Amino acid sequence: ESRLKSHPITKERSVSLELKEIKNEGIFYLPVDHQDCTQKSDVEAKIIKDYCSKILGKNYTEDKQKKKIAIDDIMMVAPFNMQVNNLKKILNKKEARIGTIDKFQGQESKVVFISMTSSDPENLPRHKEFFFSRNRLNVAISRAQCVAVILFNPKLLLADCQKINEIRLVNNFCKLLKYKI
């Protein structure tokens, strides 16, 4: 059908992250192993902090102008306020763009890190329909103008699905496995 098309300006937008594991455009899944995390994951927050340190000051091009990636060119999102506050504490940068998935609806950033936070299905603080929501996943990933990195524990994919809709929701996360770093 090919009805959905990118705006021509997107071809002129690029980042040069100079990272082996994360290319300069696309979606990337970073598996993170942790235990007993429900609404907060220090492991995921520290990984995001490390990647932010690596990409700050790298080049990006927009409107045919080269610029340096600043902290406000990076967005960090999580499904839970507790992880948002944890990211703010660990990053310790006031100008950092950190919030829940819902907060940034309609906004964009060069690079987006998505911290899914919970360790496994037993540690989900809310129902599967909230956590695995296709719409919320789409909103989170589509905030990225160039690069989206989603961090989650692969144990989340072992969710015990009781309904067809739950299978579909978890399956959307299974599809992210092909973008594994």
Each language-model region and where it sits:
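Conserved P-loop NTPase motor core of helicases/translocases
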Residues: 10, 100-102, 124
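Amphipathic coiled-coil/heptad-repeat helices and related helical stalk/stem segments
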Residues: 44, 97, 133-136
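Charged, gly/pro-enriched flexible loop segments at helix/strand junctions
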Residues: 1-9, 156-160
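A short beta-strand element within the Helicase C-terminal
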Residues: 99, 107-119, 139, 147-151
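Helicase C-terminal subdomain and adjacent C-terminal extension
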Residues: 121-181
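Conserved helicase motor
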Residues: 78-82, 98-105
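Conserved helicase/translocase motor-coupling segment
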Residues: 6-89
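Switch/connector loops and helix/strand junctions flanking conserved nucleotide-binding motifs
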Residues: 38-39, 85-87, 107-109, 120-125, ...
